[in-house]
Design a protein with these regions (language model features):
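Short beta-strand elements
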Residues: 180-181
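Catalytic palm active-site di-aspartate
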Residues: 159-172, 177
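N-terminal lobe of the biotin/lipoate ligase/transferase fold
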Residues: 5-8, 12-13, 17-151, 155, ...
């Protein structure tokens, strides 16, 4: 069990030797686990890691990413979010975040498709369940989202601009696209 800050907590009832075997198995799978005398084991996320616990730890929002579905690889985070959206709201609440390291059949506007290899992009879809919003009002969400993403990129030093209608670019390179369905 990985606790706060990446420190490993041995579950109750698991012997120290059982915990050591688990650490060895995780290291063999490529996880960077550091032994710290008298403290325990610390799981160090790889650079540019997209781990739900890392995302949740750095978010200040109250409702975004209370549930995070993470995939090493998927066809489309959007397709998964749409399927979750058809479920009961208690199973997939407003703000559910779907993220992946790799995507084989991403979709954009006008049914454009694209592939993203591991490490090429941040791939995510956010499930929103707006209350009392007419379909024609929902289109405003694209512009509001574009403004928010653009401002976030600028706060990190990127000279981000909105390329109408749904892309964020910086220095001529696309940073992200926003798809609302």
């Amino acid at each position: 069990v990985v606790g706060a800050g990446g420190w490993w907590d041995r579950p109750r009832g698991v012997a120290v030797t059982g915990g050591w075997r688990t650490v060895c198995a995780l290291r063999a799978d490529g996880y960077n686990i550091v032994s710290v005398p008298r403290r325990g084991y610390h799981l160090k996320p790889p650079e540019n890691a997209v781990w739900p616990s890392c995302i949740r730890a750095h978010l200040k929002a109250k409702w975004i990413a209370q549930r995070i579905d993470y995939y090493d690889a998927t066809g489309s985070t959007n397709r998964i979010a749409r399927a979750l959206g058809s479920e009961d709201a208690s199973a997939a609440p407003h703000g559910t975040l779907v993220i992946a390291d790799e995507q084989e059949s991403g979709r954009g506007r006008m049914t454009r498709s694209w592939i993203s290899k591991k490490g090429d992009a941040v791939l995510m879809s956010l499930l929103l369940r707006p209350q009392n919003t007419a379909p024609d009002e929902a289109a405003v969400l694209v512009q509001v989202t574009a403004l928010a993403v653009c401002e976030a990129c600028r706060s990190l030093g990127a000279p981000a601009l909105i390329k109408w209608p749904n892309d964020i670019v910086a220095d001529g390179l696309k940073l992200c696209g926003i798809l609302l369905e």
